[in-house]
Every structure is written in C-alpha cells, then in structure tokens.
Amino acid sequence: MTRATQTLLLTVTGAVLVRMAMGDTYLRYVNSWMRWPLLACGALLVLLAVVDMWRDEPKADGQPDHAPDGEPESSHVPRAAWLLFVPSLVFFLIAPPALGAHFAERAQTAVVPAEPSTEVVLPELPTTDPVPLLLEDVIIRAAYDGDTLADRRLEITGFVSRDASGDWFVTQFGMNCCAADATVMKVLATGAEAPADDQWVKVVGRYVADTGVGGGTPPEVTVEDVQLIDAPTNQYR
C-alpha cells in the first residue's frame, strides 16, 4: 500500500463518519449521544489526510524526499491493510439497516432482576385510555407489580418478531453504546394475526395477569387493535 493509498483511506474513512453523523444513518449503529464524537473523529481523519498530502508534496527543487540510506522513502504496509477499506465500501454499497426480527430471535433478552436490591415503587399510570407505555415499562411493571397494569388498555410500539413456535412479539432493542451491546425487549402479543416480520406496529391491548412475573419470560398482552406504522428515525431505546 503506497503513501497515497493510505492518505486516500484516511480521507474515505473520515468522509464516511462525517456523512453518517450529518444525517440519521448513524442511529442504526450507535447511540444518539455519539453524533458529535463521530463528527469530530471524521473531521480529524480528513484533516490528517490533508496534512499528509501537504507534507508529501515535492520540495521546491523538485527532488523527492530520500531516506538516510539514499533510497527513496517508501512505506511498507501489509497487504491486509487493504481490508480497512471494507467498512467504507459496505456503508456506501449496502448501508446495513438497524437490527431487526432476525437478530431479535437470537439476541440476549433484557433481564430484570427477580429480587431487586431495593424496594421498587412504581408510580400510578396516567388516566389516559389507552395508556402509552414503553416496552421496558411494561416489562418492569409486569416483573415487580403487575397489579399496576390490571384492567388497563395499554398502547405499545415496536417491530414484529417471532420465536421458533410461531408466536409473535412487539419488540424493540435497547442499547447503551452501540448495536453490538444491544439487548432485546419484547412483549408477547396474542389474539391477533401477526403482521410481517420487521413491520413496526402500534398495538393496543390488555395485560394478561401473572405473565412476565420476575422478568424470566416476556409479559403477554391480549391484542385489541394493531396499527401498522413507519419505523421511527431512532429504532433503539
């Protein structure tokens, strides 16, 4: 790999990071708070490439730089370094989507401690009907105090995933940093035909008592209405 190729690699990688962070694409792979670090890293890589090109220009006398032994200066980089272009090419050619149903079937499910270290006090639900809840809120309430969900119509949002038996779930991924550490949150939906996998839905239903207790299994909701919706810009929690 020549010096010019290394400079090109810096430029392309930096441009990819800047392009991702300037739009919403980065939200498929990392948390929203990482936008500015991505922009800074991308800009720094482009700046390094510009500086490298400036330093590599011929001298005023037109003579190239020479190494101490009199041989022209060259860079000896392993051919494997060409693999560094692969992530950039993948982004430009494919742009992988956010994690979806296929990964949800195999991912680690978010675990709620069966016995919390401190007493869990859950606030009363709003009086709206149906009451909109995040999947994580349904999971926590079912695990620790399912009575707070009793006799209430819940509105939950997520994408459709299935398990090996064919049951379907309203699903969403939560992540701390990036897609690599994502955990899946899901609520079992019964009483209605499943939409297509990966389809985002808004489901209205009632919590099935004594499901999801202790956080070992997903809570269950008897579906009253399913509305197909567009995927949100940020598909993670």
Stretches found by the model and what they are:
Residues 1-237:
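OB-fold and OB-like single-stranded nucleic-acid-recognition modules
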